[in-house]
């Protein structure tokens, strides 16, 4: 099992290219099931989750070509992938694949919309709470579908003639459930109105792609989205938006270690709340042509309290990284998690590096320390693992991050990008 070895103490200076967003790429890839034409996606990142979803889509009958050729990957960062699903050959999504990644459960929407039936295993993925599928089930039932849970699978059937448009209000904001409803309702009969919809940029990106395919969606980016169902969707070409979580992660790394880094190919408007928190912490963050410039001051980090919230609030996927930054703040900061339960598993590992963190319910109290010291640590999930890398960059001595397969799920060539900016980071294969 691979490990990441980090020797801390170096400021980051240079250019880091930002990859396409995993959280946008996955639903866009799944949308290829909605059409028999070719959907071409540009800026798709090289990630373990993407590779797994390619396998899942292949099982359903999607023909996949990378950069116009049948190859696994090129030598560059993000790539172009062509998806063609002339016929859906299997409406079953098996446990052995779906259990490895929660987002693969989202195929239930397109399968139900296009084929009228689906048998999908209950999902897996990061161990950060229960994340129930009730919102997905209730939303699809509102469109007329019949859904039953049997032996760990959801058996879904559309009414005769297909799904039926309806008005539905999510009791809780859910990005994944909004994705599924957008895809399913695009081919439903009549008009669907989603209330309390997720407003995340990745939801907007999916809606824009579906519209390019011939869907009729309005209101994306607001809490109310309207979808006028169409009889079929066509192919399209769409570019995956930049990864705002990767952007914020590297920005926090620069703020913590010091230095001057250009984050290339990203958009500052995708993470206004996180940028504001970084500025309050003392980092200089500014928009430049085709990117963001971040200047960090390392030892002059100010404490900042944050609360995670659905977009446009502070992203839960940057909570662990920001907590890592606050371990070096000059004072006491508080981080409150409102999206997921059990998302403080990185606290014990940060403590191994010398962090002073105490928990009270869903709030962490971080008392900044003058220095962190390297130590062996264990990655517990995707975002927690990268917070340990950030902390290791600022720690004295050597940090070994174990179980880095979590990193490979969401960060494209992380050690390569950091090394280019002066960090001492290497992957060790046992």
From Swiss-Prot:
Active site (record annotation): 126
InterPro entries reported in the protein's UniProt record: Enolpyruvate_Tfrase_dom, Enolpyruvate_Tfrase_sf, MurA_subfamily, RNA3'P_cycl/enolpyr_Trfase_a/b, UDP_GlcNAc_COvinyl_MurA
Broad EC category: transferase
Keywords: Cell cycle, Cell division, Cell shape, Cell wall biogenesis/degradation, Cytoplasm, Peptidoglycan synthesis, Pyruvate, Transferase
Subcellular location: Cytoplasm
Catalyses which reaction(s): phosphoenolpyruvate + UDP-N-acetyl-alpha-D-glucosamine = UDP-N-acetyl-3-O-(1-carboxyvinyl)-alpha-D-glucosamine + phosphate
Annotated positions of the 2-(S-cysteinyl)pyruvic acid O-phosphothioketal modification: 126
Any one of the GO CC terms: cytoplasm
HAMAP family assigned: MurA
Name this protein carries in UniProt: UDP-N-acetylglucosamine 1-carboxyvinyltransferase
Lineage: Bacteria, Pseudomonadati, Pseudomonadota, Alphaproteobacteria, Hyphomicrobiales
Gene this protein is translated from: murA
């Amino acid at each position: 099992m691979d490990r990441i070895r980090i020797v801390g103490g170096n400021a980051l200076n240079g250019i880091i290219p930002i990859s396409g967003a995993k959280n946008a790429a996955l639903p866009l890839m799944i949308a290829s099931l909605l059409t028999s034409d070719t959907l071409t996606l540009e800026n798709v990142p090289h990630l373990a989750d993407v590779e797994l979803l390619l396998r899942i889509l292949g099982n359903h009958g999607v023909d996949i070509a990378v950069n116009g050729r049948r190859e696994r990957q090129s030598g560059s960062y993000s790539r172009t992938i062509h998806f063609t699903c002339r016929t859906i050959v299997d409406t079953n999504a098996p446990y052995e694949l779906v259990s490895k990644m929660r987002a693969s459960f989202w195929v239930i929407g397109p399968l139900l919309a296009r084929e009228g039936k689906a048998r999908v295993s209950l999902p897996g993925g990061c161990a950060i709470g229960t994340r129930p599928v009730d919102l997905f089930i209730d939303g699809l039932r509102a469109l007329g579908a019949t859904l039953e849970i049997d032996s760990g699978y959801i058996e879904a059937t559309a009414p005769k003639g297909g799904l039926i448009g309806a008005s539905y209000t999510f009791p809780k904001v859910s990005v994944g459930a909004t994705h599924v409803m957008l895809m399913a309702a695009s081919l439903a009969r009549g008009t669907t109105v989603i209330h309390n919809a997720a407003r995340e940029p990745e939801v907007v990106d999916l809606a824009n792609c579906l519209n390019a395919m011939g869907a009729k969606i309005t209101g994306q980016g607001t809490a109310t989205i309207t979808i006028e169902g169409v009889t079929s969707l066509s192919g399209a070409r769409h570019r995956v938006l930049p990864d705002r979580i990767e952007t914020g992660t590297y920005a926090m790394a620069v703020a913590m270690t010091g230095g001057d880094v250009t984050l290339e190919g990203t958009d500052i408007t995708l993470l206004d709340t996180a940028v504001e928190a970084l500025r309050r912490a003392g980092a200089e963050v500014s928009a430049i042509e085709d990117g963001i410039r971040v200047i960090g001051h390392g030892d002059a980090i100010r404490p900042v309290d944050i609360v995670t919230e659905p977009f446009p609030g502070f992203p839960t996927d940057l909570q662990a990284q920001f907590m890592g930054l606050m371990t070096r703040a000059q004072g006491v900061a508080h981080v409150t998690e409102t999206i997921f339960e059990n998302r403080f598993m990185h606290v014990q590992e940060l403590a191994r590096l010398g962090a002073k963190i105490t928990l009270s319910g869903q709030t962490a109290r971080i008392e900044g320390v003058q220095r962190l010291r390297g130590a062996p640590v264990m990655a517990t999930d995707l975002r927690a693992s990268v917070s340990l890398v950030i902390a290791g960059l600022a720690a004295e001595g050597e940090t070994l991050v174990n179980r880095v397969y979590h990193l490979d799920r969401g960060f494209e060539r992380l050690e390569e990008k950091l090394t280019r900016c002066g960090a001492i980071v290497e992957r060790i294969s046992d």
